[in-house]
């Protein structure tokens, strides 16, 4: 039996990325992988040979243990660093618990409300993916409720900050103007702000992002004490730059390299503001042929 090597069984998971219009295959180990069909959606955690554990919802990649820290640091800390008060924070979505984990790193947070519409998914993540939350669900400051985000934000409860960590915005089927209007109303009295995941930035296809920014711009035009900011960071497992939009009360908002010491330097250096001129649809990747006189 000398020289006999035991080989772990490797399977293949297929993802259809509707945003980029491509399919991807991931090799993974059956051990430490899990699958569930909830009343709301289908969820898979696969133990990838490269990305470690990966979370898919309805077949679309949401997060990997190898690089989720990039996304969640970029989503949470620029807003948190901006808020004058951090007493009461709301998360809409964030079922895996990593967003809550990052918010709870701030000692000034007294109360964190997390609202997700899928209780079965949250329980699934607690058991099969505790590496995402890293104990956040046991923090006494955290309360988890299971409601629709659009309905919950209408309750009129005030917060210092709101973090919208829902799946990529679908402007055709979801009422985003209503959600963002009510979200701003929930932070207006306290002069707070909100941040949202705005999806993939593709220079050759910016209409969806521009439409989303237009909603935010219109909100700020009717609430002059607030300003909006758009920034990106590269997330390797997403194969591109991810976009975030912040609406914050006039004052400090820094997303340049000097901001927020809580973010690791290697992540911070990749977070950049997205100028308006990079949203023009004429950017199509065609090489420029005009002469350069320099």
Predicted segments, located by residue:
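Soluble small-group transferase modules, centered on the S-adenosyl donor enzyme superfamily
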Residues: 2-52, 62, 221-294
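A general beta-strand register signal
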Residues: 56-57
